[in-house]
A protein has these predicted regions:
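Sec-dependent N-terminal signal peptides of Gram-positive bacterial secreted proteins and lipoproteins
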Residues: 4-25, 413-425
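Active-site-adjacent loops and short helices of periplasmic peptidoglycan-processing enzymes
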Residues: 24-177, 181-190, 195
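Domain-terminus/edge residues, biased toward the C-terminal soluble/receptor-binding domains
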Residues: 156-160, 170-173, 177-437, 449-452
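C-terminal non-catalytic accessory extensions
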Residues: 443-446
Length: 453
């Protein structure tokens, strides 16, 4: 169900704190026509392009990404199953806009969780959101609370949800960056991409409806409605539009080893001079993807077999130990930038390092940066064992013993006692000496010699 994506060779700033902005180094700005836009390296989380990424904006039906996330989370936890059948209630169908996106699900109609997810993500059916919300949390209101709790858990700081479907409300907003965080979490579930990357699907007949043929609202992956935006590299994810939100799109694309996630919010729908109607969310997303693919590539900037530093060693007859990177480091860089342009900053855990040293022991880190922006960080490991000298270790231990505060205090006390003892001997020794001399004189004065008869 849930794919755990471990990054073994990519060590970008996403592993340090927050995210990094890849230096554009004289790249031409794509000037994306949207209120907010974001292009992120899907493998590492490094930001390739950003425009107003933290601005609070209306997401429209991009909201449904969070609804899908919470539904799939409930499936993983065993609270629901994809083949579980749900009955559409009157409460789930009430209060929805008559001209909003819909799969025409009727009250009392029975449909599986999986097919409701298809209705929600493929044709953006608003009623499917509320049906799933009731199944997951018991009520739409409780589900909205769960949406906001999940947003906080994911680190979203500019998001507040009011409903599960994205129908307009002035208090229902998010940001391009927060949508990226939500989408990234949803992509951990294989079923999410399987469903949202569906161009068209036939939903089997239900108790109240004939079979439904659904065609996606995402023109990047299906040209059934408009072929002008098809992108063979694109996969999913979700469209959204209202008069207040404009046209919005979250999408992903992969070409070779490159993989991007994009978010555009607040795009317009333009009528060109030749009468062509251009939906800018699709058009600008394609421009953003092409800009990323054309201008960036992965480059190996550090290899595990290089030895960038010798570290002094104490307590050993061996004076130095070499260190090497823990692994190769491959990062996304502008094509005009090379590994030699990066600044290497080596920080050692100790210099000198005390023996014994074990091969593979971490002795420091190396940070790679450009123009003050961090690209990557990699651990530096000892390349060989270094044995400790018994004699040098013994003298070190002796010094450490006498450097201990308790030993120093005891030493001072002993020194004071010795001084006091010497003073005592000096003072009382003189008194005894004087006393002895005075007694001797007295005896000598009373002696008159032997009497002779």
């Amino acid at each position: 169900m849930k794919t755990r994506r471990f990054l073994s060779v990519f060590l970008l700033l996403a592993l340090l704190a927050g995210f990094c902005m890849i230096p554009a180094q004289a790249l031409e700005d794509p000037d994306i026509q949207a209120k907010a836009a974001l292009l992120v390296d899907a493998n590492t989380g490094a930001v390739v392009y950003a425009k107003n990424e933290h601005q609070e904006l209306y997401p429209a039906s991009l909201t449904k990404i969070m609804t899908a996330l919470l539904t799939l989370e409930a499936v993983e936890e065993g609270r629901l199953s994809l083949d579980q059948e749900l009955t559409a209630t009157e409460s789930a169908l009430s209060g929805l806009s008559a001209d909003g996106s819909s799969a025409n699900i009727k009250a009392g109609e029975i449909m599986s969780v999986e097919n409701l997810l298809y209705c929600m993500m493929v044709v953006s059916a608003n009623e499917a959101c509320d049906i799933l919300a009731e199944a997951v949390s018991g009520s739409v209101d409780a589900f909205v609370d769960a949406m906001n709790d999940k947003a906080k858990e994911l680190g979203c700081t500019n998001t507040h949800f009011v409903n599960p479907n994205g129908l307009h409300d002035s208090q229902h907003y998010t940001s391009a960056w927060d949508l990226y965080l939500i989408t990234k979490a949803a992509l951990e579930y294989d079923d999410f991409m399987r469903i949202c990357d569906t161009g068209s699907i036939t939903i089997p007949a239900t108790n109240l409806s004939q079979e439904r043929v659904l065609h996606t609202t995402n023109y990047l992956i299906n040209g059934w409605r408009s072929r002008g935006y098809i992108n063979k590299d694109a996969h999913g994810i979700k469209t959204g539009s209202t008069s207040d939100a404009g046209h919005c799109l979250v999408s992903s694309a992969q070409r070779g080893s490159l993989s991007f996630l994009s978010v555009v919010l607040g795009c317009e729908r333009l009528t060109l001079e030749d009468g062509e109607i251009r939906t800018m969310s699709f058009y600008e997303t394609n421009r953003l993807f092409n800009w990323g693919f054309d201008n960036f590539s992965y480059k190996t900037v550090v290899t595990a077999d290089e030895y960038p530093k010798e570290v002094p060693v104490s307590l050993s007859k061996t004076e130095h130990v070499t260190v090497h990177p823990a692994q190769d480091v491959e990062i996304l860089m502008p094509n005009g930038l090379s590994a030699g342009d990066l600044v290497r900053d080596i920080q050692l855990t100790g210099s000198p390092v005390e023996a014994p040293v074990s091969k593979g022991q971490k002795l420091g880190t190396m940070t790679l940066s450009y123009n003050g922006k961090t690209y990557a960080q990699v651990d530096l490991l000892a390349s060989n064992d270094v044995d400790a000298s018994k004699l040098l270790t013994f003298w070190r231990d002796v010094k450490l013993f006498f450097a201990r505060p308790v030993v120093k205090i005891v030493g001072v006390i002993l020194l004071v006692l010795v001084v006091l003892l010497l003073l005592w001997k000096l003072v009382f020794g003189r008194r005894r000496y004087r006393y002895g001399r005075s007694v001797g004189r007295g005896r000598n004065q009373g002696y008159r010699g032997r009497r002779r008869f």
